[in-house]
């Protein structure tokens, strides 16, 4: 392992931190920074970074089919919690119906 490999792994770690911070800021800005949404966002972030790490390590080992498999499997897995987090964060609040004083026929 040379210095370039170490720098790439460090860059992946910093990218994971920056993405997680962005998820936290996004959810906090929406006013929906709850624990389940944070966990769901973390899982999306984890699988995305894991797919990138899998792709890089497979490329450095010259396993080109494993790169595609990692992107499809782990990248596709990252889409599920990412979509759930996005949909729940942008879900409008329920409108409360105003009860009327009179009964309509």
From Swiss-Prot:
Main location: membrane
Keywords: Cell membrane, Membrane, Transmembrane, Transmembrane helix
GO cellular component: plasma membrane
Protein's cellular compartments: Cell membrane
Upregulating conditions: Coexpressed with pceA.
Transmembrane domains' residue ranges: 3-23, 35-55, 66-86
Protein's membrane topology: Multi-pass membrane protein
Family, similarity comment: Belongs to the PceB family.
Function of the molecule: May act as a membrane anchor for the tetrachloroethene reductive dehalogenase PceA.
Name this polypeptide is given: Probable tetrachloroethene reductive dehalogenase membrane anchor protein
């Amino acid at each position: 392992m040379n210095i370039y490999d170490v720098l790439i792994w460090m860059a992946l770690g910093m990218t994971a931190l920056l993405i997680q911070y962005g998820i936290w800021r996004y959810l906090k800005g929406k006013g929906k920074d709850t624990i389940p949404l944070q966990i769901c966002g973390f899982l999306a972030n984890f699988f995305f970074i894991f797919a990138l790490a899998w792709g890089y390590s497979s490329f450095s080992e010259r396993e080109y089919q494993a790169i595609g498999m990692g992107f499809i499997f782990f990248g596709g897995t990252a889409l599920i919690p990412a979509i759930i987090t996005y949909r729940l964060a942008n879900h409008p609040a329920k409108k409360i119906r105003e009860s009327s004083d009179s009964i309509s026929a």
